[in-house]
């Protein structure tokens, strides 16, 4: 037997239960990982609330973690018992002591990166990789807008953009978060609690606006984001922290300057083991060179997952949060 977090109904943090369960034996192409650290991500709240339906109830939760290979299936070729591994695209169930995944979902973890760092960086770091390097390939000298710059993905984006020679304007909700974003490489910050974001972007870009805007907030920032994109520029919508964007009239894109909009997801970019490992290797390289540092500002025991979700929803967290089995 092992312990895991599960939910039998959709709802708030109170639906999360810390339960005993029987881990499955790995199938022929599967690996069982003993988690040493587990990542907490906003997407976890979408599954818990039912915004993203789980495959069935009761369900496990979480998709990111790091640990050691405990058992392998008969046809596994890339991993052996004892290997240090990390993952971010597996099935729901990472909030557990033991997790079974297809071997294609795992990456090898370098010795220079510990389990907590890996669990804190995998999903957010790989998300940052595809956003800045693939969805739109940033070039040095460009000025971009990134919402929620002091959040988990935001702090990685600040650092990665700086390493690329890109000027990142980050939106934040407080002076403390503004300082945090700047400490991580943001060129400028806009405090949306008392500043007009679109007006400040016009000022900071000499009226040119931004070739790309990254928005994980959703409903509350949709109109503002469109107003910050330069003509024929791209709005990258990659989250729904304030709720999903609905009722969109596509004509607004022509009115705002023939804009493009995309709604990417990690799975579409890391769709082969080779691509996933290559993306992870680029991320790990930046960490080992010191271009990206990992801020783990909150740690919770696995049994405290409900409290961790409460803190995340209230936006009382900064940087990354990990759960410890």
From Swiss-Prot:
Supply one GO CC term from the record: cytosol
Which reaction(s) does the protein catalyse, per the Swiss-Prot or TrEMBL entry? Answer: 2 a quinone + NADPH + H(+) = 2 a 1,4-benzosemiquinone + NADP(+)
| Keyword field | NADP, Oxidoreductase
Enzyme class, spelled out: oxidoreductase
> What EC number(s) are associated with this protein in UniProt?
1.6.5.5
Q: Name one GO molecular function term.
A: NADPH binding
Matching SUPFAM superfamilies: GroES-like (SSF50129), NAD(P)-binding Rossmann-fold domains (SSF51735)
CDD domains reported in the protein's UniProt record: QOR2
Q: Which Gene3D superfamilies match?
A: Medium-chain alcohol dehydrogenases, catalytic domain, NAD(P)-binding Rossmann-like Domain
List the signal peptide residues. Answer: none
Family, according to the entry, reads as follows: Belongs to the zinc-containing alcohol dehydrogenase family. Quinone oxidoreductase subfamily.
The record ties this protein, via PANTHER family, to: QUINONE OXIDOREDUCTASE PIG3-RELATED, QUINONE OXIDOREDUCTASE-RELATED
NCBIfam families per record: PRK10754.1
| Name of this chain's protein | Quinone oxidoreductase
From what organism does this protein derive? Pseudomonas aeruginosa (strain ATCC 15692 / DSM 22644 / CIP 104116 / JCM 14847 / LMG 12228 / 1C / PRS 101 / PAO1)
């Amino acid at each position: 037997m092992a312990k895991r977090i599960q939910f039998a109904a959709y709802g708030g943090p109170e639906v999360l239960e810390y339960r005993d369960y029987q881990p499955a034996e790995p199938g022929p192409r599967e690996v069982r990982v003993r988690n040493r650290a587990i990542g907490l991500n906003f997407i976890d709240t979408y599954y818990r609330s039912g915004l993203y339906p789980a495959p069935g109830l009761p369900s496990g939760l979480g998709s990111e973690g790091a640990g050691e290979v405990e058992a392998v299936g008969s046809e596994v070729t890339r991993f052996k018992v004892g290997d240090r591994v990390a993952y971010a695209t597996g099935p729901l169930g990472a909030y557990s002591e033991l997790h079974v995944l297809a071997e294609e979902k795992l990456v090898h973890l370098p010795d220079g990166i510990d389990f907590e760092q890996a669990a804190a960086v995998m999903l957010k770091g790989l998300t940052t990789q595809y956003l800045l390097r693939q969805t739109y390939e940033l070039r040095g000298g460009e000025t971009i807008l990134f919402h929620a710059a002091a959040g988990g993905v935001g702090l990685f984006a600040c650092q990665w953009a700086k390493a690329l020679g890109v000027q990142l304007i980050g939106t934040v909700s407080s002076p403390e978060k503004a300082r945090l974003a700047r400490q991580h490489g943001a060129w400028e910050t806009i405090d949306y609690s008392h500043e007009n974001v679109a007006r400040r972007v016009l000022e900071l870009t000499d009226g040119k606006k931004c070739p790309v805007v990254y928005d994980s907030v959703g409903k509350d920032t949709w109109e503002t984001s469109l107003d910050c994109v330069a003509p024929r520029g791209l709005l990258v919508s990659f989250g729904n922290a304030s709720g999903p964007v609905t009722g969109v009239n596509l004509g607004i894109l022509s009115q705002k300057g023939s804009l493009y909009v995309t709604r990417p997801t990690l799975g579409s970019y890391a769709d082969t083991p080779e691509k996933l490992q290559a993306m992870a290797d680029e991320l790990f390289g930046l960490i080992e060179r010191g271009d990206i540092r990992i801020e783990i500002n909150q740690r919770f025991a696995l049994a405290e997952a409900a409290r961790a979700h409460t803190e995340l929803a209230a936006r009382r967290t900064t940087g990354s949060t990990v759960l410890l089995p």
